[in-house]
Amino acid sequence: MSFEISVEEIEELIETGNLNIDHALKELGATSQSSLNKPPSQSSRTEGNDGGTKISRNPAPVEAPAHTSTAQRSHNEENESGRQNLDSLSMISNKPQTGTLLMGSDTQLPSPSKTYQGLILDAKKRALNEPRRDQKITNEHGSMNDTRIFKRGGNIDTRKEAWVTQNQRSRTQPPLQDIEESTRFHGLTEEPQYPSGAIHAAHQSNQLPLSKNAHVEDVPKFANYASEILDAIKALEVRLDRIEGKVDKIMLTQNTIQQTKNDTQQIKGSLATIEGLITTMKIMDPGVPSKVSLRSLNKESEQVPIIVTGNGDVSKFVDQDNTITLDSLARPILSGTKQKTDERRAGVRIDALKITVSEMIRDLFGDCDKSKKLLESINMATTEQDINLIKTNALRSIT
């Protein structure tokens, strides 16, 4: 089973292996230092035929060297300080991680006899010898194979690469502390062929298609009237906003309605009180008695002599011919003339009487045909007698 690993994953695996080696070397260094101070029954390391390291007990006493060279001591101190700095800066656990590193068929396992620097150089050489992402190789059949790795959501045919090199990543972004996950590729955007509709997005297939052609039955249908549906939804939203505004206004008038109800109850109580007081009162209406008619009253009246005393013209009060007056010498004179009135004052009195009778008719009859006829007859009247006659007829029609 063949598989490929990206450059970033290889570098992260190398870094993890280096940290494990550092931890192992640190432990071995601590063991060797402690062996110098322990009794003679101390363990010693021996090389096996198979290239592995074996631990054996040596009963013979081993004496530590009295002194070491200055260069060797400085070299050990620098190694220990560098390891401590790496341990303090690294966010990965210092404990060795157990597991199997999956490599390609042509990858060699690191030899435990090599040093730390040698392991780093070997890893760099393997990374340089591996084919790049954009490199094409020829297989045994003579066809070209593209070594670029296809990720989820990506497109092999696109020219835009979804990754950057490690140097560019270190310049633009901080170093990652974990394995980077695959990023989502949103695809290429194209303008829809139907301006009045919309094409639904199809779900991405997990399998790599063999060709760019697709079956007609698998392609989702486009919406021909998407814009009209949106217009209808917007119209419904506008109507809903208007209805909400009207409901808010109605809710504001709720307090006014309650206040009106309270006022109505108070008015009903006051009206009931007034009705009770009216029943205790006796109202006398100075009108025509119901049992005696006006004609019977006129028959009962008789002519009697009337004496008007004082100076002045009696013609203003008496309009009959058979009147006796006294002249300037106090002599009785039979007056054969009719009532005389001042023409200037007569016109003013007639106009005032017309206005009074017209208002009375409007109050009694309102705006009806009978009221209009009476008003027309009042306007056509020229004397006070005519106006008084119209007034009398109007009052009789009511009773």
Curated annotation (Swiss-Prot):
The keyword Chaperone does not apply. Residues 30-112 are annotated as: Disordered. The keyword Phosphoprotein applies. It comes from the Viruses. Keywords: Coiled coil, Phosphoprotein, Viral RNA replication. Residues 30-46, 82-112 have a biased composition (Polar residues). Residues 226-253 form a coiled coil. Gene3D superfamilies: 1.20.5.300. It holds the Pfam family Paramyx_P_V_C. Residues 224-287 are annotated as: Multimerization. Signal peptide: none annotated. Essential cofactor of the RNA polymerase L that plays a central role in the transcription and replication by forming the polymerase complex with RNA polymerase L and recruiting L to the genomic N-RNA template for RNA synthesis. Also plays a central role in the encapsidation of nascent RNA chains by forming the encapsidation complex with the nucleocapsid protein N (N-P complex). Acts as a chaperone for newly synthesized free N protein, so-called N0, allowing encapsidation of nascent RNA chains during replication. The N-terminus consists of a long intrinsically disordered tail. The central part contains the coiled-coil multimerization domain (PMD). Forms a four-stranded coiled coil structure. The C-terminus constitutes the alpha-helical domain that binds to the nucleocapsid (N-RNA complex). Belongs to the rubulavirus/avulavirus P protein family. Homotetramer. Interacts (via multimerization domain) with polymerase L; this interaction forms the polymerase L-P complex. Interacts (via N-terminus) with N0 (via Ncore); this interaction allows P to chaperon N0 to avoid N polymerization before encapsidation. Interacts (via C-terminus) with N-RNA template; this interaction positions the polymerase on the template for both transcription and replication. This is Phosphoprotein. It comes from Human parainfluenza 4a virus (strain Toshiba). The lineage of its organism: Viruses, Riboviria, Orthornavirae, Negarnaviricota, Haploviricotina.
